[in-house]
């Protein structure tokens, strides 16, 4: 713990820099509006194209190779909590309001360009469609997140208190909203799937293939928020080559050796179920008593979409109609800038006892997850244009866990809806 204690003054100094407090990137890493071009000096990991790099490869430059155990990040993209490494998600949940929804205030840096803003807003809207989480505009709340384009993709786990940074560099947005969803799941209190306490039943960690010194990113957690069976298709799962030293797999699935892991397309069905279970709610509000997790339709007309969702959709629709979006506003609504002269500083999470771990069950795979399967009918990447044109206000209900069997996916599936890697944004050229 001595190394960690000596590190915190440096970390706090980093988070107090003007580029962080003002919700703007560091001047050396982002001049003007941060676009979606790949920064100079970054090289692909192994044979991966630069646009296909996942979180570990993007963040690798933030971790000192000589002493990776002293990094301010753990597990590749999580800001190290202090003084203890792992906490139960129930100790730092975001509070539920009287309306039965969980509001997470956010600030979006004005340094993002319009395509980048659209990707981030799409991720916020996906949570609102599928869960009781509502990302609302910051209005002097004590606890809030500040989304800024620093170097790398990282966040804290759960509500830390005061302002907490969510870094989404332009490279984190090149593959669409998947990495944004991943980091926001951290914000809501969830750790990585591949570090679950029961992970050894479902994956094998190939320690000899991990970059020397980076083994700390594969240590099993003691977090108790598993809540659902192991899910190979979770947006919280890292890919096979995470922190690979020579391009060979560091993670091997055991139940389905050829299954795709590390998808960054959308929330899986179990990702949604975890959010609903952790916060004790349904997609439209609190969980109905005596009727299970999801209430069925009563035949009445659906309630209007919430104001926050309407604002997000208006912004996205306006941008989709504009042939050349520019400026710092979207859909006639100004995009909030950084936190400015925020009176709130960084605070450590509260320490609580860990609750009992959920019993292990069979893992889910990409093929068995209706939301993560390419071309699936649930509102995800494949239906992006349909909900922009006219979104249904009836929330999507994730499939039941019962009867789900792990089915291996042969090879690497195509992106949903005909999406092309590294060409998510308007105007981006194919390399």
UniProtKB/Swiss-Prot annotation:
**Alphabetical keyword list:** Cell membrane, Cytoplasm, Cytoplasmic vesicle, Disulfide bond, Fertilization, Hydrolase, Membrane, Metal-binding, Metalloprotease, Protease, Signal, Zinc, Zymogen
- Single Gene Ontology BP annotation: proteolysis
Q: Which residues form the active site?
A: 183
Q: Which residues bind Zn(2+)?
A: 182, 186, 192
Give the EC number(s) under which this enzyme is classified: 3.4.-.-
Instruction: Extract the InterPro entries matched here.
Output: MetalloPept_cat_dom_sf (IPR024079), Peptidase_M12A (IPR001506), Peptidase_Metallo (IPR006026)
Question: Which top EC class applies here?
Answer: hydrolase
> Which cell locations does it reside in?
Cytoplasm; Cell membrane; Cytoplasmic vesicle, Secretory vesicle, Cortical granule
Cofactor binding note from Swiss-Prot or TrEMBL:
Binds 1 zinc ion per subunit.
What does the record give under GO molecular function?
Answer: aspartic-type peptidase activity; glutamic-type peptidase activity; metalloendopeptidase activity; zinc ion binding
Partners and quaternary state? Interacts (via N-terminal domain) with SPACA3; the interaction occurs during fertilization.
User: What does the record give as the function of this protein?
Assistant: Oocyte-specific oolemmal receptor involved in sperm and egg adhesion and fertilization. Plays a role in the polyspermy inhibition. Probably acts as a protease for the post-fertilization cleavage of ZP2. Cleaves the sperm-binding ZP2 at the surface of the zona pellucida after fertilization and cortical granule exocytosis, rendering the zona pellucida unable to support further sperm binding.
Tell me what this protein is called.
Astacin-like metalloendopeptidase
Give the gene symbol.
ASTL
